Each structure stands twice: as structure tokens, then as C-alpha cells.
Regions:
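Basic, polyanion-binding surface patches
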Residues: 1-154
Length: 154
């Protein structure tokens, strides 16, 4: 299968939009829009996130590190766009979208899932991050930002 055929096929996989966020030991904040986030196990609660080796957050996500998976609401496209743009990387936290007092998280997200990295697996161009879920908080109603076929869904 060609790379192009695979990309076209995957464009039909609709998913919620998530932003992964973390803070390094010096307090520097990191975030990225993630297209590959999934639950792994229910007992114990765990998740799997795939991170490109070239992503700035890549080196921060090591064993024992805390991170947050922020599942965005429909009105949070701007956060997704900020966190997916290398050109706007320095602007990602220059707004009031975030609580950065501990592990950074998006305020008013659909859900915030607070995790601890348990294991990472190198696979070609990506790192597979396996994390245990320590806590979560969610909105009362479903209003999740969805993405498919190269754009946000209504």
C-alpha cells in the first residue's frame, strides 16, 4: 500500500480532538494536538497516545512524567489549531485557555484526563506512550470537537 492510499483511508476515521499537555522539570509548558489517543484498559484505567519523534513534547513524555489529555469542546478549535502549529508554538500558552498551576490543562474542556507515563515504546517515526489514569473531570453534556477528512465536523 502506498503512503497516499493509507492517508486517504485514515481520513475517514472520525475522532474527538485531543490536546496533550505537560510541564518539564524546569517548568516549561508543552502541548500538542494529538490524532492518536485511545483508552487501553479499564482496570487499571490506562490510555495510549502516539507522539511523533519531531514533536516538541516528545522528550518530556518519559516514564513517571505527568501529562493531561484534554478532549476539546466544539468551541475550542482555536486551541487545537494553536497546538498543531509549529509556527505558533510560542503562543500556545499566551491566553486564558489554560490552568498551568500543576500539570497544565485546558479549562472548560469536554474532559481532562490526568495521567502518569508508565511506559514508552519507540516505533519508527513515533513514540507510543502508555499512561495510567490518575484522575479525570468532564463536562456535564456531550459537546465534543470532532475531526475527519482533514477538517472539523459540525
Amino acid at each position: 500500500m502506498s503512503k497516499e492510499q493509507f492517508i486517504i483511508a485514515m481520513r475517514f476515521l472520525a475522532s474527538s480532538v485531543s490536546v496533550i499537555s505537560a510541564k518539564d522539570q524546569s517548568g516549561k509548558l508543552y502541548s500538542m494536538t494529538a490524532s492518536s489517543v485511545t483508552s487501553l484498559t479499564i482496570d487499571p484505567p490506562s490510555v495510549l497516545v502516539c507522539v511523533n519523534n519531531s514533536a516538541s513534547i516528545h522528550d518530556v513524555l518519559t516514564q513517571g512524567k505527568n501529562l493531561c489529555i484534554n478532549i476539546l469542546q466544539k468551541n475550542q478549535q482555536e486551541i487545537s489549531n494553536l497546538c498543531s502549529s509549529k509556527q505558533r508554538e510560542s503562543q500556545r500558552f499566551d491566553n486564558d485557555f489554560w490552568d498551568t498551576s500543576h500539570v497544565p490543562f485546558v479549562k472548560k474542556a469536554q474532559s481532562n484526563i490526568f495521567c502518569k507515563v508508565e511506559e514508552t515504546i519507540a516505533y519508527h517515526t513515533h513514540k507510543i506512550v502508555i499512561a495510567s489514569v490518575e484522575s479525570s473531570q468532564s463536562a456535564d453534556t456531550f459537546n465534543t470537537l470532532m475531526y475527519a477528512d482533514g477538517g472539523y465536523l459540525d
